[in-house]
């Protein structure tokens, strides 16, 4: 069971049963409690859970409100045939999130939120994921379209799958209403799923403009999304403007900021390109001074710590940390915020 720090303890009434409650209830619990949450990656196939559990143990000191478990579509590999041509095959390098989510929740007593994505999945496969999660008593999920395959220029839906997050939401809503994807009634419907979605303070890379991007977020809220968590960002001003514009068009769900400390020198150029996020000028100036991984790590810790402090000062009580390749940095930021 995770250790509880006084300044970050959840309301006792909530904490007793938070493994089986709507995450948005935790996010809107009131009282000024500061909530951390963390996102982790399933282990590579064949490597076991020891390293993952060791990582989670490092975060348990901060009494996380919940832990997200990512999922990724299969990757393409090329196999040479006898005739000299190449065949493109899908290979899955990491297990799905269902078993990992159950193992984390049972071992650590922390609410878990597995990701369910359109990418690489059929509607039937998603339906079985929902059934498995319901059997395990996991009621919170994050619904995402997922990234395009590495070799594809644009997102290509899996045959029999979904093209958009809204299609995935429709399937989950039908399941919640007591129907399988083919319209067959579920004889013994279980508890309904609560779900969150993603949002983008600097616009999704495929959105025509910010207004259209916000329109789709509003649509997801109206379809039933309980909260949204942002893509990582380094400029709080963009987050505040995004939230302001969202509220102006009637988006009322919690918008949780996603923070990822820079942890090594290569990330100073890779992160803005891969995640389509800008460095504010102050960060860019300091980034150019970094000569080593340690320089970049220290800058990342200091910048993210100050980001979080500004968010707290502005009344944001829930912060979500992206931990991949930044576990120790995230832990240090969280420690400084206690």
Predicted regions and their residues:
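Glycine-rich, positively charged N-terminal anion/phosphate-binding segment
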Residues: 20-28, 50-57, 61-65, 69-108
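N-terminal amphipathic alpha-helix/helix-capping segment at the start of soluble metabolic enzymes
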Residues: 14-38, 180-192
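Glycine-rich, proline-tolerant flexible connector loops at the mouths of alpha/beta enzymes
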Residues: 65-95, 149-159, 225-242, 324-326
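Flexible, glycine-rich active-site loops centered on histidine and acidic residues
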Residues: 123-170
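Conserved, mostly hydrophobic/aromatic
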Residues: 39, 67, 133, 220, ...
